[in-house]
């Protein structure tokens, strides 16, 4: 009887949460957005038509701002504060690692307006998070950012760096994207000074303060870690867990970048310096 009561209480709690505009409970178990392979096909259709961008740096050393998990929900104060930091020391590019919005009624334009200086004074590259797929929001993401799986290069006077963006918003790359990733790395990685992969879902999790946060299937994790090491990836940047972490595995530096979300007592981001060597520092507002 007690067991039935606990189950009933839990079920009632889940139903209550499911009615919340910021929590897509069904979407946590089966996606209401397109599958990862379908999303990848749509991204490739855009890439095939529009090509892959290049960012020009006037110097061989340059900075990259990395931020994530703002969960836009009406108030952009932390995003505004971060943008002011950027404006005080602009960089040629910035990376956003996912979870642009937090609910089905979120205003995507708020994020775009707040980050406009990053895209006007440099280039802003975005990857989707799980919250950007909940409530069937993939078409919204696509209408604003056009692609979720792509690569670009930074061209310096004496070097070139490769960046690869992966769509891991549903906790997997899928077969097609995984195949594409290896094709890109095999064909290009050896021609670049540094290779950086950025995506939403983390590969390692040490800090337990956020409770459980989903990641890849263990076999997929092993496969991707091997792939990154095999082709000499230098840096893997992820978000999702909201905490700052750094793990070195197989010669690759894996970072989880802290969340910029308003609710966080210590909202943060990362500042990466690319040159002969790579340095990354966690910063807090």
Enumerate the predicted regions with their spans.
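Active-site glycine-centered loops adjacent to acidic/histidine catalytic or metal-binding residues
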Residues: 69, 98-99, 129-130, 200, ...
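N-terminal active-site segment of His-dependent metallophosphoesterases
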Residues: 21-109
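C-terminal motif of bacterial Sec signal peptides marking the signal peptidase cleavage site
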Residues: 16-19
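Bacterial N-terminal signal peptides that target proteins for export
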Residues: 1-7
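Hydrophobic beta-strand anchors of alpha/beta hydrolase catalytic cores
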Residues: 64, 94, 163, 195-196
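Extended active-site neighborhood of metal-dependent phosphoesterases/phosphodiesterases
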Residues: 33-48, 106-194, 214-230, 235, ...
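Short acidic, glycine-rich surface-loop motifs adjacent to enzyme active sites
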Residues: 188-208
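Histidine-centered catalytic micro-motifs
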Residues: 196-203, 234-244
């Amino acid at each position: 009887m007690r067991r039935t009561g606990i189950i009933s209480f839990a079920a009632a709690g889940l139903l209550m949460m499911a009615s919340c505009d910021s929590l897509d409970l069904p979407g946590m178990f089966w996606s209401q957005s397109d599958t990862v392979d379908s999303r990848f096909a749509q991204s490739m259709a855009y890439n095939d038509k529009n090509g892959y961008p290049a960012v020009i740096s006037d110097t061989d050393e340059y900075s990259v701002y990395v931020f994530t998990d703002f969960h836009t929900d009406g108030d952009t104060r932390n995003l505004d504060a971060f943008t002011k930091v950027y404006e005080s020391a602009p960089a040629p590019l910035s990376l956003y690692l996912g979870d642009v919005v937090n609910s089905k009624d979120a205003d995507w334009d708020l994020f775009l307006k707040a980050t406009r200086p990053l895209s006007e004074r440099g280039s802003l590259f975005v990857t989707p998070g799980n919250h950007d797929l909940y409530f069937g929001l993939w078409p919204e993401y696509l209408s604003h950012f056009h692609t979720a799986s792509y690569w670009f290069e930074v061209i310096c006077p004496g070097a070139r760096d490769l960046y690869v963006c992966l769509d891991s918003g549903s906790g997997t790359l899928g077969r097609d994207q995984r195949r594409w990733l290896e094709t890109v790395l095999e064909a290009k990685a050896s021609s670049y000074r540094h290779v950086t992969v950025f995506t939403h879902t983390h590969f390692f999790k040490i800090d337990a303060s956020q409770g459980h946060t989903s990641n890849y299937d263990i076999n997929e994790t092993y496969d991707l870690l091997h792939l990154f090491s095999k082709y000499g990836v230098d840096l893997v940047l992820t978000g999702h867990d909201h905490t700052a972490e750094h793990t070195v595995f197989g010669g690759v530096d894996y970072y989880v970048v802290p969340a910029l979300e308003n609710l966080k007592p210590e909202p943060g981001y990362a500042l990466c310096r690319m040159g002969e060597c790579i340095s990354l520092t966690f910063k807090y507002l």
